[in-house]
Amino acid sequence: IAPTILELAGVEPDGMLPISGRSIVNILRSEKNGIVDETRKYVFMGRERHSSSRWENLGYPQRAIRSREHLFIWNIKPERWPAGAPQAINNETGKVYPMYGIDEKGIHHSGWAFTDVDDAPSKSFLIENYKDPVIHPYFCMAYDKRPEFELYNVNDDPFCLHNLAGNANYVSVEKELKTALQNEMERSGDPRMIGPDKEIFETYIRYSPIRIFPKPDWEK
C-alpha cells in the first residue's frame, strides 16, 4: 500500500525507512482483464496484533502467500484463538465472564469474548446458537482455533472451506508455497523467521485500552 500511495502522490521515498513492497499503480491503471503483471507470481500477507483480545495483550501472528491457484497460511501460534480469547475478565471487578460471553439468560455480550471481532448481530447470533447442529459449523469457522498450516485451492474452493494442508495429493504444492513464503520472510527480514527476537511484535506498546483475560492453559 505504501509504495502505491507514494507513487500516486508523486512522492519519492528519499530519507524514509526501506520499503520492501512494490507499487501496484500499473495494475490499478491497466484496462486488461485477468493477470495484468506477469512478473508477479505471488502475493504475501501478514498479521500480528489487531486489538487487545488475548491474555497479556498477545496477538495472532499469521503469514500467508497467494498464488494464482492456491492460498497457503501459516498460523504461527495455533494454540491461540484467532478471534480473541473465549473469556474476558471485568477490568473493574476482576470477575471472569462466562465462556463465550454468554450470560445465564443465554444472551451474548460482545465485549465478554472473541473481542477481535467487532460487535454485530451476526456475531451474537452465531455464539448464542453455537450448540445448534445447523449453526455449529458456522460458529467454528468464525471463532474456533485454526491448524498451524492451511492450504486452499482458491479456484475450486473460493470460500476456503476445505483445508488441503497435509493432503498427500498436494504435498508438492504445499512445499513450494511454504518454501516461497519462508524465503520472502528471510529476504524481508521478518523477525518471525530470522530473529534474533522472534517475539518482538508481542512487546510493542498498545496505547488504546487493554482488556484483561484469564491465563490460557498453554501458559500454565
Cite the ranges covered by each PLM segment.
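Active-site-proximal alpha-helical segments within enzyme catalytic domains
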Residues: 1-8
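Surface-exposed charge patches
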Residues: 4, 63, 183
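Sec/Tat-exported extracytoplasmic proteins
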Residues: 9, 28, 32, 181, ...
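C-terminal cap/loop subdomain of S1 sulfatases and analogous C-terminal strand-loop tails that border
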Residues: 13-150
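Long, internal low-complexity/basic segments
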Residues: 117, 127-149, 154-220
